[in-house]
Amino acid sequence: MAPSPRTGSRQDATALPSMSSTFWAFMILASLLIAYCSQLAAGTCEIVTLDRDSSQPRRTIARQTARCACRKGQIAGTTRARPACVDARIIRTKQWCDMLPCLEGEGCDLLINRSGWTCTQPGGRIKTTTVS
């Protein structure tokens, strides 16, 4: 008597390797962890790129790109020489010194055309930042 089609062994059953449920659980957890870790907490920023050009004497040009996750009414800006989420009004009105962009002990002054600001250190060294 021939074996019944339901209980007989299939020849192609070994073509696919068996994967345990533990493997799939691990894969799902790993993908969730990767997705979660790439998210920034609300109201925080991180520096993505930082380039420095010191080819000119007595002058260093630095460019940085930041990624921010700002809350409603905030926008990416600078506080204490670090990227931060600041009140959008500051950016709209170009009152850059309201962000407190300079380090503690430095003085902040707007550039004449409001395209940026300067931070003056007690020793007289001046750092100029322009917004692009």
Curated annotation (Swiss-Prot):
Keywords of this entry: Cytokine, Glycoprotein, Secreted, Signal
Entry-linked Pfam families: TAFA
Name of the coding gene: TAFA5
Record carries keyword Cytoplasm: no
Gene Ontology CC, one term: extracellular space
Any one GO BP annotation for this protein: negative regulation of vascular wound healing
Glycosylation sites: N113
This protein's name: Chemokine-like protein TAFA-5
GO MF: cytokine activity; G protein-coupled receptor binding; receptor ligand activity
Native species: Bos taurus (Bovine)
Function: Acts as a chemokine-like protein by regulating cell proliferation and migration through activation of G protein-coupled receptors (GPCRs), such as S1PR2 and FPR2. Stimulates chemotactic migration of macrophages mediated by the MAPK3/ERK1 and AKT1 pathway. Blocks TNFSF11/RANKL-induced osteoclast formation from macrophages by inhibiting up-regulation of osteoclast fusogenic and differentiation genes. Stimulation of macrophage migration and inhibition of osteoclast formation is mediated through the GPCR FPR2.
UniProt xrefs under PANTHER family: CHEMOKINE-LIKE PROTEIN TAFA-5 (PTHR31878:SF0), CHEMOKINE-LIKE PROTEIN TAFA-5-RELATED (PTHR31878)
Superkingdom of origin organism: Eukaryota
Compartment annotation: Secreted
Entry similarity comment: Belongs to the TAFA family.
Signal peptide limits: 1-43
